[in-house]
Regions:
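Conserved small/polar residues in nucleotide/adenosyl-binding loops
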Residues: 329-334
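Surface-exposed loop/turn segments and immediately adjacent short secondary-structure elements
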Residues: 307
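Conserved, single-site charged/polar hotspot
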Residues: 1-279, 285-294, 300-304, 321-328
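Histidine- and aromatic-enriched segments that form or immediately flank copper-ligand environments
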Residues: 312
Length: 334
């Protein structure tokens, strides 16, 4: 997963159950949410209820994308179209105008637990035919008619300890796998990520040795932990983190932390905070550059002079211009 959540430009939907032979469609994220909301909700509902429900649908979808729930299991899509697993999506389905306008307004806002960064797995059901521990769609209508605002409706169902992230950056959905195997001698943030995840998995599978210290270096301790993980989960025990091992670690780690459940253990900022080199230069690439771009894009919501910057992971001309502008407007006057 990316270090910090972003709203994907596009999302890939499987039009059926995960193992069915149904086709995939890749659509803009906003179009996906508009379609889901138009098939899950009634446009005549109070606006507060619509906004609360749409916020839950956004958070649900972003959780699937951020945790790579399906991709870590070997599927080539982000979410399914069926309410048996996810939320209703009808390819080519109609969209209601008022729902479309609400989505345009809030598509990059989502729910988190206080202190956590991952989009909340905002489970919901209709509250009449089916019941669940999350939001009741028809119940939200009653709350809205009683005068509750969207945030109060969400608090009623998900607890008082939720926050809303507003205006999250929009970027392409980039797979978390670094694109090359990690092995003895590898170095970087991807190595550190694997070390941290294996150490958390150790709490549930104590046979996997603890990696200490956690660093950016793929050392003997890391290799030993990877081999034991591979043995436990029936992978080739080569001690190398290729794509299959990377995503199996991701799947198990997401499972033990319950990140794709309403009662999530949560993911804090310190858990994903990358270690930074002292200097980044024009032409540099990698997750550190993406992180700087994320903060520059975030700053743009508060500093109108800040030029837009895409999360490309490449220190390019746009990134350089954004850095110059940031320094110009934030550096103390001499």
């Amino acid at each position: 997963m990316p270090t910090y959540p972003v709203v994907p430009t596009f999302i890939t939907v499987h039009l059926g159950l995960p193992d069915s032979s149904a086709p995939n469609v890749t659509v803009p994220f906003t179009s996906y949410i508009k379609n889901v909301a138009s098939h899950e909700l009634y446009p005549t509902w109070p606006e507060a209820a619509l906004r609360a429900n749409i916020m839950a649908q956004i958070s649900f979808a972003l959780n699937r994308v951020y945790t790579e729930f399906y991709r870590s299991r070997g599927y080539d899509f982000d979410i399914t179209s069926t309410t048996q697993r996810d939320q209703a999506y009808v390819s080519g389905g109609n969209v209601f105008e008022n729902i479309s306008q609400i989505v345009d307004d809030i598509f990059n806002n989502y729910i988190v637990r206080q202190g956590n960064i991952e989009p909340l797995f905002a489970a919901f059901c209709d509250g009449v035919r089916t019941r669940c521990n999350g939001l009741s769609q028809w119940g939200s209508v009653d709350l809205a008619e009683a005068g509750d605002i969207p945030y109060e409706i969400l608090q009623y169902y998900y607890g008082d300890d939720i926050n809303i992230v507003f205006d999250a950056p929009v970027a392409d959905n980039i797979p978390s796998y670094p694109g090359r195997p990690l092995e003895r001698g590898s170095y970087g943030q991807s190595v550190r990520t694997i070390q941290q995840q294996l150490n958390r998995i150790h709490e549930n599978y104590p046979g996997i040795p603890v990696i200490s210290p956690v660093s950016n270096a793929y050392d003997r301790n890391t290799e030993d932990a990877v081999r034991e993980f591979q043995r436990v989960f029936n992978l080739d025990t080569d001690g190398i983190v290729g794509k299959a091992t990377w995503y199996k670690i991701k799947e198990v780690w997401t499972g033990v932390k319950q990140l794709s459940e309403l009662a999530s253990e949560g993911l804090t900022l310190t858990e994903v905070q990358p270690t930074f080199p002292e200097v980044l230069r024009y032409g540099d690439e990698g997750v550190t550059v993406s992180t700087v771009q994320y903060y520059l894009a975030f700053l743009g919501y508060f500093l109108p002079e800040q030029p837009p910057v895409a999360l490309t992971g490449v220190f390019d001309d746009d990134t350089r211009d954004a850095v110059y502008t940031c320094l110009l407007y934030t550096s103390p006057s001499p």
